[in-house]
């Protein structure tokens, strides 16, 4: 079915329909254009969002980069950024393949439609002009027929009139004959016009207009087909990016699944483990000795206000770990401020310190406190600490790791320089064999420079190896001290201090000595110190599991133990995050070995 046959008389309908089709095409182009703008704005907002939350140029030294949570978040942001890029591709595809092409096609369709309707209107105008000519010839024929009939009646009447002259009758007959001739000519012209009009009308309705209508039908069908293809381009633009978007979503899923809480905890240990030994138990400070002593002995034997107690107190405090952000000094003990009170209040002779200025006493107290605070600051590695080449400003464990990193970097640089030296030697040999390729002497400066770099790097490697060995020994010694100190709970302090008897015994010998504060403490006062070393000879702890040595280990460093491949060992302590595990051999030897050299089975 075609429009030329079925809709031969629906010219205006076809005109409205084709115009509606072009309007629909323009409407779809406008819709796609706004859709592309929405996609572009969406992609722009996504990129701005990613830029807002993406870390600013993270480096390998940033601690946050090493956590899986941060790495997953960065990967998630990168996937969102890639997703935004795919939305930009959708917007670009819609703008080029749909908006531009369909807009251009719409203009072509409008021109073609205009041409077809102009042709139809021109044919219709020609048919109307032919019909007007036919009407004119018809009216002329009708008029001439009436004039001829009138002239014939006039001639007949004059012919029958007896009073009319022969000339009048003859003139009337000639006039009637003329009118008859004119009517005959008008008839012939009318017949010719009618025949011509019928031919033109048949051509118009059966040939010319059907062809125009068929062209309009073909144009409209092509427009509809192209519009349908444009509808398909909308979905095709989405389908083209679906695989990449799927990969982005899969990457987001992988980023979510790559969060490893256990590993992050281990990373935190690796970043901030200091390697210091845990602080020891506080010693019992018996301030009742001041009360039990004789006032005269107290004033004569301890002119500096019981330096023994103050030394023991400072010694025990130095072992404490400063957990707080700010380490406030402990208030001075009662013995420091009031050690001379019994002598001043008693009836005996006054103490040598009784006449001293209280400000001088406080000055001595501040001198005893300030070094302790300084040791805390150096212990923690404060902000004002100056970084050194051997990283001694860091805690032992962090120092060991940084030295290990520096050593690995130097070894890589050394290997690179050695490879370059070998390459230069080979090039020099080639130049010596084939002088036309180059001058061997031109390579001497580069070879000398490479040799100098190698020597320098070797010295640095030796230096860092020595520092690393020292740092590892510090870590192992700190770990051993902590283990021996906390192998068993300490004994509770007794009510009677260990130096109570010795203080009264030694009081007589201190009467004639003004410098007793500079003498070492008595045996009773050293008892708590020896108690710490007695803990090293306690009964060995029971193993917590078994392990098998996968590789041979020499165990030449302090605190380590050697083992053979395939040897069965007893697991005494698990890895605390530093890569070492404490084991015991069947012969009884006990020490640390690398965790990666073991296959562990816990009880």
UniProtKB/Swiss-Prot annotation:
Residues 471-603 are annotated as: Required for interaction with FASLG and localization to lysosomes. Residues 67-259, 388-481 form a coiled coil. Residues 393-470 form the REM-1 domain. Residues 316-329 have a biased composition (Basic residues). Residues 293-603 are annotated as: Interaction with PDE6G. Residues 487-543 are annotated as: Interaction with DNM2 and WASL. SUPFAM superfamilies: BAR/IMD domain-like, SH3-domain. It comes from the Eukaryota. One of its GO terms (biological process) is endocytosis. It is found in: Cytoplasm, Cytoskeleton; Cytoplasm, Cell cortex; Lysosome; Golgi apparatus. The record marks 166 as: Mediates end-to-end attachment of dimers. Tyrosine phosphorylated. Also phosphorylated by PKA. Residues 333-346, 497-510 have a biased composition (Low complexity). Residues 546-603 are annotated as: Interaction with WAS. Residues 1-117 are annotated as: Required for translocation to the plasma membrane in response to insulin. One of its GO terms (molecular function) is lipid binding. Residues 293-539 are annotated as: Interaction with CDC42. Residues 1-264 form the F-BAR domain. The F-BAR domain binds the phospholipid membrane with its concave surface. The end-to-end polymerization of dimers of these domains provides a curved surface that fits best membranes with around 600 A diameter, and may drive tubulation. Belongs to the FNBP1 family. Required to coordinate membrane tubulation with reorganization of the actin cytoskeleton during endocytosis. Binds to lipids such as phosphatidylinositol 4,5-bisphosphate and phosphatidylserine and promotes membrane invagination and the formation of tubules. Also promotes CDC42-induced actin polymerization by recruiting WASL/N-WASP which in turn activates the Arp2/3 complex. Actin polymerization may promote the fission of membrane tubules to form endocytic vesicles. Required for the formation of podosomes, actin-rich adhesion structures specific to monocyte-derived cells. This is Cdc42-interacting protein 4. The lineage of its organism: Eukaryota, Metazoa, Chordata, Craniata, Vertebrata.
């Amino acid at each position: 079915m075609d429009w030329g046959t079925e809709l031969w008389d629906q010219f205006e309908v076809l005109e409205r329909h084709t115009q509606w089709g072009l309007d629909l095409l323009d409407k779809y182009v406008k819709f796609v254009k706004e859709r592309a703008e929405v996609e572009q704005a969406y992609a722009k907002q996504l990129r701005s969002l990613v830029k807002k939350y993406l870390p600013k140029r993270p480096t390998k030294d940033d601690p946050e980069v090493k956590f899986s949570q941060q790495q997953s978040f960065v990967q998630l942001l990168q996937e969102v950024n890639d997703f935004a890029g795919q939305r930009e591709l959708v917007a670009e595809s819609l703008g080029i393949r749909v908006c531009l092409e369909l807009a251009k096609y719409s203009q072509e369709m409008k021109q073609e439609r205009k041409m077809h309707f102009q042709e139809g209107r021109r044919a219709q105008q020609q048919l109307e002009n032919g019909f007007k000519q036919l009407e004119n010839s018809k009216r002329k024929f009708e008029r001439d027929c009436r004039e001829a009939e009138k002239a014939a009646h006039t001639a007949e009447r004059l012919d029958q009139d007896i009073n009319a002259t022969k000339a009048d009758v003859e003139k009337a007959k000639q006039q009637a004959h003329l009118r008859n001739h004119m009517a005959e000519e008008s008839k012939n012209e009318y017949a010719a016009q009618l025949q011509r009009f019928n031919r033109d009308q048949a051509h118009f309705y059966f040939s010319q207009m059907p062809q125009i209508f068929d062209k309009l039908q073909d144009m409209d069908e092509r427009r509809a087909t192209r519009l349908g293809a444009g509808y398909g381009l909308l979905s095709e633009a989405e389908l083209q990016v679906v695989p990449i978007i799927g990969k982005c979503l899969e990457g987001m899923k992988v980023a979510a699944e790559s969060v490893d809480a256990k590993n992050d905890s281990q990373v935190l240990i690796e970043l901030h483990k200091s390697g210091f030994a845990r602080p020891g138990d506080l010693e019992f400070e018996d301030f009742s000795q001041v009360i039990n002593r004789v006032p005269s002995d107290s004033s004569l034997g301890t002119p500096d206000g019981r330096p023994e107690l103050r030394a023991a107190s400072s010694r025990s405090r130095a072992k404490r770990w400063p957990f707080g952000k700010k380490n406030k000094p402990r208030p001075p003990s009662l013995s420091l401020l009031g050690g001379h009170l019994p002598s001043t209040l008693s009836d005996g002779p006054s103490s040598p310190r009784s006449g001293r200025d209280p400000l001088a006493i406080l000055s001595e107290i501040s001198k005893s406190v300030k070094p302790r605070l300084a040791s805390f600051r150096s212990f923690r590695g404060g902000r004002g600490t100056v970084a050194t080449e051997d990283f001694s400003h860091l805690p032992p464990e962090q120092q060991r790791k940084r030295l290990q990193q520096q050593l690995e970097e130097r070894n890589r640089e050394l290997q690179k320089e050695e490879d370059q030296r070998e390459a230069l030697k080979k090039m020099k040999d080639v130049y010596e064999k084939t002088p036309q390729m180059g001058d061997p002497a031109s390579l001497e400066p580069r070879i000398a420079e490479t040799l100098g770099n190698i020597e320098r790097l070797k010295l640095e490697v030796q230096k860092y190896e020595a520092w690393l060995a020292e740092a590892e020994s510090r870590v192992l010694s700190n770990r051993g001290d902590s283990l021996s100190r906390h192998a068993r709970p300490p004994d509770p302090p007794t009510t009677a201090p260990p130096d109570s008897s010795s203080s009264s015994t030694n009081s007589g010998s201190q009467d004639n000595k003004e410098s007793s504060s500079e003498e070492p403490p008595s045996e009773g006062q050293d008892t708590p110190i020896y108690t710490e070393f007695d803990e090293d000879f306690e009964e060995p702890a029971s193993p917590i599991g078994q392990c098998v040595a996968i590789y041979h280990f020499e165990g030449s460093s302090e605190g380590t133990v050697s083992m053979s491949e395939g040897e069965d060992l007893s697991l005494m302590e698990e890895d605390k995050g530093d890569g070492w595990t404490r084991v015991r051999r069947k012969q009884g030897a006990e020490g640390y070995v690398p965790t990666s050299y073991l296959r562990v089975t816990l009880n």
